[in-house]
């Protein structure tokens, strides 16, 4: 685990999965954040939200740009591990019982149908639409009881950032077992409905944000404006932090 931009990242994909397996052998629950550019922007502006992001097990790097920034600043290689990738990896393993929370019921129904092709066990799993509420207003005790009755190991949450991360932090003290992972639009990507992830060639060339802008212009343009407005200060701060590091990061970590 390493800290960059004040966020605790786990870049080693194998260690991500090992950490999940270890956590599930112990009492209590925890959560993993899937940190993209929007989360990076929000943590820079909101220290309380930064504490939420770092209050879980760790973050995985959903942003394709953070690895570029780390190469520019530190000369190191770090892999991206997108939310849609960890979602596909865990669902296809057929290792855990899962529960899927959030999104509209239409999306959840289609998601269940599509995921069942990847993992037939999904047919017996719970897909639950959550009410449209402020994050303070959810019945966290009731949601925890539902999850524990379901005996889910992995709790997938799709409420959009920053709401879904705050949701996990508030649910954590009520939940006796499980690892929560908030994955935003990934439910939509895998549902087979309107919103899809960018083609692989765009992802490889750090152009996914362009695809997302055309898919959801009103939402994504606002996000991009926020990211661009804070990026110079964020990079400048990390350059300063580099000088204060006692140990230089290792050159490369395998994805």
Predicted segments — roles?
Residues 1-79, 84-85:
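N-terminal nucleotide/polyanion-binding subdomain common to many enzyme families
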Residues 29, 96, 175-179:
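A short helix->loop->beta-strand "cap" motif at the edges of active sites that frequently abuts
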Residues 37-39, 159-164, 186-187:
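Short glycine-rich anion-binding loops that position phosphate/pyrophosphate groups of nucleotides
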Residues 67-146, 150:
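Conserved beta-alpha
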Residues 68, 197-252:
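A transmembrane-helix-recognition feature enriched in membrane-embedded lipid enzymes
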Residues 112, 165-174:
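Short Gly/Thr/Asp-enriched flexible loops that form oxyanion-binding sites at enzyme active sites
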Residues 130-135, 176-213:
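Short, flexible loop segments at boundaries between secondary-structure elements
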Residues 147, 151-156, 161, 177:
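Proline-aspartate-enriched helix->loop->beta-strand connector
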